Amino acid sequence: MTRYLLSKLGQAIVTIVLVVLVVFTLLRFMPTAGYFSKEQYKTMTDAEKTAYLRNMGVLDPMPVQLQKFVSGLFHGDLGRSITLYPNMPISNVLGEKIQYSLLLNFISWFTAAIIGMPLGVAMAKNKSGLVDGLGTLYVVLIRSIPSIIIHFFIQVFLSKWFNLPMLFYMDQPISWLLPIVSMSIGSIAGYATWLRRYIVDEENKDYIKFATVKGLPKAFIMWRHIFRNAIVPIAINIPSDFLLMLSGSLVIESLYAIPGTGGLLIKSITAMDNPLVQVLVLLYGALSVLGVFLRDIVVSFVDPRIKLVASNN
């Protein structure tokens, strides 16, 4: 098991190093206008712009720039935003915005899990019954209607029917309700659909039929064998789902005026804020790699096949 995890850790480290190199190199081909505020770019002469870039180290040889960049990462210095949040440390920009995205997305993810998974189990246990029919209807409606229409319906009509705030306010927890509903409603359908499918697939396997013939209690078979194996494909995606919360939700955060990280990368690219673009691309790349690594760790604990291979090796 240790050998397996160390192998995955090594792969993750190599991938992150490659991400740093690729992001650093590509950003050096972006227009240098992204290192100036609008006022600076308009008023500075060419000589002043060159001196400014040289002072920032942008004109240094690539190896020197890379060494300074990596050193800054290790010391927590992510640089400063230039055009989008003039002269504001990027760490402060991310610190202010991530808290909103992380809080709302975590609550939404937890809500979706505690509702969607029991719904999926109930649908599988009552296959072709009332619960399964209603659950399937819910899933079909959620999947067939464009998400933006669902979010708009939730914001406009639920706020009116239940007298809830239409916009998000951090100091008013009641205003969190509609964004959480909007964020979780699709995930509930996803958890229910996939867990139902995996449970039904497990029920049709030979080892379950054999356990039934042996006379084992249905509840024991369901929770000891069927559910345990059916939850594996869902459990392995939980770490990556959790890390994706840090990237926020562009549509929902815009709809409810949530000052989170959703759309921050697009805004920074539009504003040609090179240092902020560099950090965000690196952050999202590192989160993706970390999500895959954490998924491998979860798999090693919940999937008995990984344990068997590890023990045999």
Task: Label every PLM stretch briefly.
Residues 58-115:
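An internal, D/E-rich "acidic patch" concept
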Residues 16-67, 163-172:
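Hydrophobic alpha-helical transmembrane segments of membrane transport/permease proteins
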